[in-house]
Amino acid sequence: AFYLQRGTSQDNRNIKANFYSGRATYKLSTKNSLTLGYDHYSGTDFSSTNTLTETRTFSTLYGPGHKYLGYMDYFGVPENHGSGINDLLLTVNLGLGKNGSLEATIHQFNLPEGYLKNGIKVDKNLGQELDIVYNQKLDNVISIKAGFSTFFYTQSMEQLKGRIPNQGDHALFGWLMLVVKPSLTIQKVRDHP
C-alpha cells in the first residue's frame, strides 16, 4: 500500500506526507508461514525550521485499528506526536491441530524523524512489542480468539508518551473474543400455481 497526502493544513502549512506498507510471506507448509513486514508513516522533523510552513506528518484520519502498528494501540493515531512512526515486524503463523492456529508478531518501533522533548532531541528507538494470538475454530460459524501483548519501553518512549521515568519497563494487555460469522442466504420463493 502507498498513499500520499498533499494540500494545506488547518494552520495553513503545506502538507507533504506519505504512508507505505509492505509484506512478504514465506510458506513453510500448508499451515505454517513467516511474514516480514514494514510500515512507514511519515513525520515532521521538529528540529527543522521548515515546521512553521510545512508538515510531513501523515494523518490516518480515523486511526488504522489493529491492521497496522500492533495490538497495544500505542500508535493508534501516529500523528498525535507528529514525528511519524516506522514498524519493522516479523510474524510467525503456526497451524495447531485441525482447527487451531497461533500467531506471534514482534514489532520494532522507531521514529522516522527527529523529536524534541523540552528542546532535547529524543533517540529514535521507541521499543518492541510482542503480540500473540491463539485462534480456535469451533465450527464453520463460531471461533474463539485469545490474545496477549507486551511492550518493552525505551527511555524515548517514556519521553514521547509522557510516562513517568523508571516506573516499569513494559506494559501488558490481554483479551478474549468470541467471533460469530453467520452465513446468511436468501432463497427465492417460488410462486405456486
Model region roles, listed by residue range:
Residues 4-95, 101, 117, 159-161:
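Extracellular/periplasmic loop regions
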Residues 168-193:
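Outer-membrane beta-barrel "beta-signal"
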Residues 1-6, 38-44, 77, 106-112, ...:
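Transmembrane beta-strands of outer-membrane beta-barrel pores
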Residues 31-34, 98-104, 138-146, 184-189:
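Repeated loop/turn-to-beta-strand initiation elements of outer-membrane beta-barrel proteins
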Residues 69-75, 103-129, 145:
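Outer membrane beta-barrel transmembrane domains
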Residues 1, 24, 34-36, 92, ...:
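Membrane-embedded beta-strand positions of outer-membrane beta-barrel proteins
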Residues 130-152:
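C-terminal structured "cap/appendage" subdomains that terminate the fold
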Residues 14-20, 84-88, 124-130, 168-174:
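Residues that define the transmembrane beta-barrel architecture of outer-membrane proteins
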